[in-house]
């Protein structure tokens, strides 16, 4: 058994692990990275964020070709199979792996591929694919092993027609009809992707509203666009059992309804990847979702062991995970990079996409904050008209007395990019966070960004 000594060992090479390893390495620490896959990037790169967003991009291009009158003059609509579209995602994954492998090499982070588990509070044992065991001693260890889809024991995920958000990438055909169980972020994104490929989608939601954490107006807009694009949403429904057939699947609901489709995609919940870490050897406990509890410094109940990313739960976003990992390492190296990551933008890559930051109307009303609303509808924006993307809006919530921006909510073309302008202003201290910034700033024309000026004027016109 080979033995190595490090200042910091990071378990998991997803966004959280990468952020942690890079920060520690740049602070002069000797760092090792352990990942169970033979390539870096974690589930984000190989199974989650990157492939699903690459799929979405390709599907949007197909949709634009099939609906744009200019392209219709060239030829007939074209339809692509899911495996064909997936090829573009595979190319992006390869490029991401190459880039990230280079990051570790340039920063002299040692990579170990294999299953890592705790022998004690300062020792990680890595079982390599060839069976060799390597022992890593470390002053500090950061757990960033991510999460995986939750799989109820009563559902046969080995059935060839039953998938989760990891295994859906192995789908070898394009179903005519698909059941998506779970209308969270992942479920809504995949519902959009398959709908864009011409698949009839049944989206089963066990709640009464899509993505209820969003501003209600944005949630309602998403519901409208879903119903307008071959996505049937069934609210307040819970599964009773899943019946696998030779040529499809039947979902039995507790309400007595039955839905038959060519395949079922399970998108209801995620579980932290902690079961193989040997946490029982160091006294760290996990909750019912397999997640680790940490304090504001991202420290676990064991002082020299930290956690970051999906494995600690909320907000389970790749962007936040990277910052959490960087902050966890910042707590170790004490270079001023620590911060508690709590106010992050939400990006939801449905078609059209959604992004938001700050408070929504429901929260401000409940808190009795005197706010006002400014809106800009994309159908009136020159850039949206040029791009043929008239659906959507930008919504700014601000304090009617101080003009402080309290929340920004965007639905439509480039929403996940547009939101960062509002985020930058909201992060300014004191009176610099002011709605009038958008009135007094010159925006390029035509751009989607100028929606901020339109929305600001709309909001100011509501004041009296």
From Swiss-Prot:
Gene (UniProt): sthA
GO CC terms: cytosol
Enzyme superclass (EC): oxidoreductase
Identification of the protein by name: Soluble pyridine nucleotide transhydrogenase
Main subcellular location of this protein, as a coarse class: cytoplasm
A biological process term (GO) from this entry: 2-oxoglutarate metabolic process
Binding positions for FAD per the UniProt entry: 35-44
Names of required cofactors: FAD
Matching Gene3D superfamilies: 3.30.390.30, FAD/NAD(P)-binding domain
Sequence similarity: Belongs to the class-I pyridine nucleotide-disulfide oxidoreductase family.
EC id: 1.6.1.1
Cofactor, free-text remark: Binds 1 FAD per subunit.
Subcellular location(s) per record: Cytoplasm
Pfam families: Pyr_redox_2, Pyr_redox_dim
């Amino acid at each position: 058994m080979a033995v190595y000594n490090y200042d910091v060992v990071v378990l998991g090479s997803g966004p959280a692990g990468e952020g942690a390893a890079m920060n520690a390495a740049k602070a002069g620490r000797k760092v090792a990275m352990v990942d169970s896959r033979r390539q870096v990037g974690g589930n984000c790169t190989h199974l989650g964020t990157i492939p699903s967003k690459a799929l979405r991009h390709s599907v949007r291009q197909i949709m634009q070709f099939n609906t744009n009158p200019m392209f219709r003059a060239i030829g007939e609509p074209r339809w692509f199979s899911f495996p064909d579209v997936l090829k573009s995602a595979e190319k992006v994954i390869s490029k991401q792996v190459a880039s990230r492998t280079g990051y570790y090499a340039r920063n002299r982070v040692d990579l170990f591929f294999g299953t890592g588990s705790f022998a004690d509070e300062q020792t990680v044992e890595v079982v390599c694919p060839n069976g060799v065991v390597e022992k890593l001693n470390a002053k500090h260890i950061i757990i960033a092993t991510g999460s995986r889809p939750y799989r109820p024991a009563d559902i046969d995920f080995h059935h060839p027609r039953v998938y989760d958000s990891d295994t859906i990438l192995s789908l070898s055909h394009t179903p005519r009809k698909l059941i998506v169980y779970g209308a969270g972020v992942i479920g809504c994104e995949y519902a959009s992707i398959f709908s864009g490929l011409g698949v009839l989608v049944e989206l089963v939601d066990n709640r009464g509203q899509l993505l209820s954490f969003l501003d209600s107006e944005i949630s309602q807009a998403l519901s409208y666009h879903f119903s307008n694009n071959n996505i049937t949403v069934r609210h307040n429904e819970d599964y009773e059992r899943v019946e696998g057939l030779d040529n499809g699947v039947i979902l039995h609901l507790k309400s007595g309804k039955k839905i038959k489709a060519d395949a079922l995609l399970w998108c209801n919940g995620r579980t932290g990847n902690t079961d193989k870490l040997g946490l029982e050897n160091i006294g760290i406990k996990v909750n019912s979702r397999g997640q680790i509890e940490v304090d504001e410094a991202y420290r676990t109940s064991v002082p020299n062991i930290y956690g970051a990313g999906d494995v600690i739960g909320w907000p389970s976003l790749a962007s936040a995970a990277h910052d959490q990992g960087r902050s966890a390492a910042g707590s170790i190296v004490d270079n001023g990079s620590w911060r508690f990551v709590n106010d992050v933008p939400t990006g939801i890559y449905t078609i059209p996409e959604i992004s938001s930051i700050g408070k929504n109307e429901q929260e401000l009303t409940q808190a009795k904050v005197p706010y006002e609303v400014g809106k800009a509808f994309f159908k009136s924006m020159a850039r949206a008209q040029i791009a043929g993307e008239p659906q959507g809006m930008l919504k700014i919530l601000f304090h009617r007395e101080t003009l402080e921006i309290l929340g920004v909510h965007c639905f439509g073309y480039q929403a996940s990019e547009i939101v960062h302008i509002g985020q930058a202003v909201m992060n300014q201290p004191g009176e610099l966070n002011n709605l009038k910034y958008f009135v007094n700033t010159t925006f390029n024309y035509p751009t989607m960004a100028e929606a901020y000026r339109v929305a600001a004027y709309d909001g100011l016109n509501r004041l009296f």
